[in-house]
Amino acid sequence: MELRSWLLWVVAAAGAVVLLAADAQGQKIFTNTWAVHIPGGPAVADRVAQKHGFHNLGQIFGDYYHFWHRAVTKRSLSPHRPRHSRLQREPQVKWLEQQVAKRRAKRDVYQEPTDPKFPQQWYLSGVTQRDLNVKEAWAQGFTGHGIVVSILDDGIEKNHPDLAGNYDPGASFDVNDQDPDPQPRYTQMNDNRHGTRCAGEVAAVANNGVCGVGVAYNARIGGVRMLDGEVTDAVEARSLGLNPNHIHIYSASWGPEDDGKTVDGPARLAEEAFFRGVSQGRGGLGSIFVWASGNGGREHDSCNCDGYTNSIYTLSISSATQFGNVPWYSEACSSTLATTYSSGNQNEKQIVTTDLRQKCTESHTGTSASAPLAAGIIALTLEANKNLTWRDMQHLVVQTSKPAHLNADDWATNGVGRKVSHSYGYGLLDAGAMVALAQNWTTVAPQRKCIVEILVEPKDIGKRLEVRKAVTACLGEPNHITRLEHVQARLTLSYNRRGDLAIHLISPMGTRSTLLAARPHDYSADGFNDWAFMTTHSWDEDPAGEWVLEIENTSEANNYGTLTKFTLVLYGTAPEGLSTPPESSGCKTLTSSQACVVCEEGYSLHQKSCVQHCPPGFIPQVLDTHYSTENDVEIIRASVCTPCHASCATCQGPAPTDCLSCPSHASLDPVEQTCSRQSQSSRESRPQQQPPALRPEVEMEPRLQAGLASHLPEVLAGLSCLIIVLIFGIVFLFLHRCSGFSFRGVKVYTMDRGLISYKGLPPEAWQEECPSDSEEDEGRGERTAFIKDQSAL
């Protein structure tokens, strides 16, 4: 028996050697597949294939089909004449050919970059597998060619020798000074180096003898100068909406203050820019917004209190150190999707990239450095498949990210078997895996949104509140969901010390997401007003079943507050057939995969098919649509079913002022045609009135406390001002008394009689200096005024 196995092995090896030799000599190698021309449609082709033992692999195009036979050798030096002849005699077969294996080589020759600092880019080419597997994506031939990335920041040095070759003016603008030039403003401290550093991570030119290389070193790179001046809602919106059909990826490494007490996010215009980007950008495929998760770790901040990283429209990226640990600056939250490398402790390496004044740096740090690395990997992935939507990209990240080599105490396995962490999301991005999966990716079904009103009456939070609700995920409705993507818990609550709250959401499949951890520096009594806490931890789970919201007071203090509204918002998909699709016909142009890209007149494109009437929540619009041919991407003007604005249920246009009807939680303004949320007072259930004699005293105390709490900030502010004025007056009188000052003006106060010592500073002689007008103007030029505080991460 052993001899027989050995002989079989020898024969197989010899056959392989013969095939390799034949291949090298240019001889034909026949496969076990045939191309067959059979008019009459797929059913006729299936019958012919089945009759002769073939399997129909599908339509090549028109009446040409791809047949495969299990019994035929996969690779042979001679054709299989018997099978070929029997199939040829079939009257329905007009032509056939046994397929021959052809040698094809990618014309991108991969060579390791020769840039001087490339060996120091450990996160691209690690020898211990602690890297982002970027070299594997390069080896597959993907370097970012044809992809455009814009850095939304303080400008980029467009003439930097490692950026100039890839600079794209169409992806650049100076919103601060209203001109097309994003060149940063130079200062002594090089304050505006942030954008240039981020740009180099994405697309620093390769093999030019300067610095290192970008992740997508053949991508086009631009920058928007928008942080070096007044940052307003309009400034953010203009930046986020710049050239959305030219720019593929926007990378942002900034956000509200990471001080552990701020709750802030995009205002109306920026939120609209996000929505327009994902619904209309890239010809309807959706702009991709990559966001740094935040640097507030030392302040115990939560990135779920940052409305930019907490948005479903952004791909939020966290950081890991060289040794796979959570950095000291990292924020943990349930909205983070994945991680790339960045800086850590003093003994760990940092990020190599371009720097101001045409220099290089080896010390780029923070989540600022993580987001551009992710943007570069996403650029490689888009080159592999330019038809990916913004949601496709998030699915690819979830499916390919790697938890290995990352250390954290909170790794958990969700309901579909994936490991997920509040510090790392689904793990490290893997560039090689992403481009490999992207090449044959099937576009995900259109996004569905199911809104479930959970709370029907206000509930006292006390020490701990638990709200349970069984949901069907909109079963029986067109927006029924069976596979989750993002989940939002929209909460309105009051609490006398917001930072003591911890909030958790448990899915029907048992995944526990921390929506909010305690924030010791948050003393606010403002609570949350319809704040959308988002989690990605239940991705691909079935949302049907019991959801549990837990709110707890993490301190020993006798805090108090009320949960007045809880809306669960589910985003996801369902298999085709679970809801009735709109009528479909009228396709004018099909791709090779039988997806419709252009419809006949009177039809609109929806879910890869053509419909006469767009479904509720969509409107027909003529847009530029992109689709890939064999060698290029074509742009075609076509009528497409475009989603209504997020605030509308149905609409007559994409703007928030085009609403025809509203979701259940909002009301329609018939004049403005906008949907506005009901005021908090109208949402609160009024308690039933009791006769005064029957009201126990314990009911009066919470109301009194709540009343005091509502005015507490104003009272404290007034007392503080009064105390400051009194102290200032006492010190003023004391100093003038000591210096012999007379209110009649007989003596003049001078400082040469003594010293003034400030706490925390060494005593030194104080001299009052009045700056000249020129000095004052120069100083004003060096200062930056922010209407809306932003911090570079």
Curated annotation (Swiss-Prot):
Residues annotated as binding Ca(2+) 2 are 174, 179, 181
Query: Which UniProt keywords are listed?
Result: Autocatalytic cleavage, Calcium, Cell membrane, Cleavage on pair of basic residues, Disulfide bond, Endosome, Glycoprotein, Golgi apparatus, Heparin-binding, Hydrolase, Membrane, Metal-binding, Phosphoprotein, Protease, Repeat, Secreted, Serine protease, Signal, Transmembrane, Transmembrane helix, Zymogen
Identify which top EC class this enzyme belongs to: hydrolase
Query: Annotated region Disordered: where?
Result: 160-182, 673-697, 766-793
Q: Which residues form the active site?
A: 153 (charge relay system), 194 (charge relay system), 368 (charge relay system)
Q: In which tissues is it expressed?
A: Seems to be expressed ubiquitously. Expressed in islets of Langerhans.
Q: Where does Ca(2+) 3 bind?
A: 258, 301, 331
Membrane topology category = Single-pass type I membrane protein
* Amino acids binding Ca(2+) 1: 115, 162, 205, 208, 210, 212
Q: Which is a Gene Ontology cellular component entry for this protein?
A: trans-Golgi network
Task: Spell out the protein name for this chain.
Answer: Furin
Q: Which organism is it from?
A: Mus musculus (Mouse)
Q: Which gene is this protein's source?
A: Furin
